[in-house]
Amino acid sequence: MSLYLGAVLGANYNFPYANFGRKDSDMYQTRKIGVIGQGHVGAHVANSLLMQGIADELYLCDINETKVTSEVQDLRDSLSFVPYNTKIVNCGDRYEELSCCDIVVNAAGKVALAATNRDGELFYTTDAARTFANRVVDAGFDGIFVSISNPCDVVCTELWHLTGYDPKKIIGSGCGLDSARLRTEISKQIGISPKSIDAYMIGEHGFSQIGAFKAATIAGKKLSELEAENPEKYAFDHMQIEELARKGGYVTYAGKQCTEYAVANSAARVCAAVLHNEHAVLSASTLMTGQYGEEGIFTSLPCVIGAEGVEEVYTLDLSERELEGFHKSCQHIRDNIAQLDWWDEAAWNAK
């Protein structure tokens, strides 16, 4: 400490940078993220995490050994152009190696099955989850599951049901991307940046999701108030905008037969909120414990997300139409779950 600072602050002042530059292992904590599934989405999730410098170590898994080897090589070849010298590990199908991770992203799926409906992957992705879920948990994993495989809400419910894992540590990407699409569509109508629009899609990550327009705000003012004050600028067809947000992914799919960038960035956003303990409010799929009378399934509502996973779930002021739609959306998730034998304990235990 300089003589001047010593005189001003006192000899016993603990100068915050007194130990700056010391080599102390306690000052550095390695951030590790595993990604299961190296298809279109999983590979782009890994790339987003790498490009944004979110993880210090990436652990990639896939049942296709050749595919995961190629993805690992491609990412390693990018290391000269990204923020940090991230370690990239090829785990093949050795899911137990993910037990060291802070976050495991589930991106296992088969995009061709979801060509017209996210429910198309129902049996494939739930079967895939059974191949790794307990292996990861039984190996000692104590981090956060971020699941983006579709149908997202069903797969999240399955992960919780099969493993008995703390549901707060299972986060579905859910309507996070759909909410971004909603804000973008509203932005196009009213000329306000989507980053300044607070609006959410809720319910199932699928065709039954609902836009929560009654609770939507800009600068703390309800969208309905702004519309009343200046209808020329703020009035628009809510149902049309909701439909555009709901089907945005299929517009992307129509021309390239997959969705990649936005869903990968959405997953990376959740990972960043966890690793940085942001306490960020994001629309995500989480276990219902009585919200609007719903319980026992995962679905999307605005969630506070930090290092421990889902810290709090917010309910919104919904219109009668929105509330009815939310309940119908939850029922659709239950109908999908009812098709799966793991939900029938007797049938599952008989296997």
Please annotate each region the language model reported.
Residues 38-39:
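Glycine-rich Rossmann-fold phosphate-binding loop(s) that bind the pyrophosphate
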Residues 163-169, 178-320, 324-351:
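C-terminal substrate-binding/catalytic lobe of Rossmann-fold NAD(P)-dependent dehydrogenases
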Residues 8-30:
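A short, basic/flexible loop-to-alpha-helix module at the beginning of a structural domain
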Residues 81, 86-144:
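Rossmann-like NAD(P)-binding element
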Residues 42-43:
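N-terminal Rossmann-fold NAD(P) dinucleotide-binding loop
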Residues 10, 63-101, 338-342:
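Conserved N-terminal Rossmann-fold NAD(P) cofactor-binding segment
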Residues 118-183:
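Rossmann-like NAD(P)(H) cofactor-binding subdomain of soluble oxidoreductases
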